[in-house]
């Protein structure tokens, strides 16, 4: 049984939902129902059937998160480079500064290789002084392995407002997780931010 702490980093489950069939290989997807026009459109929307596969045979990861960027109007973007293994290990000690009440948007850049990635989600749990203050998730979608015609995927999240007011100001710790429909965690990292009166 998973602990409450483990569930903090997984998306909320939809009661009664389960994957309808086991994973299939890329070749099986590409050859499936070749005469079904709607399925061909669906496969094309996933990126199947076009371009040279860029999967690295020496890297077994299916989803490689390249970066996470925070954009806020009138400010230069702040990017967390996650492209190298272990790059995320120092983020907790280097807090971001966010102005209270500021509008911001997060943007994730990532690569997919070897197989279709189904139901990728971003889950973020934020704590202040050890108490969870929020848990949010954003569905990123399903993706085929990257090709030379689509070398990287970029997903822009919904715009958010930073909390405001004297009580909201202070230091926060966050855990961000990229997880798929199979509950496989592709990346999890801790980071921190400070809500302040000014940038």
Segments from the language model and where they lie:
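N-terminal onset of structured domains
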Residues: 1-151, 158-199
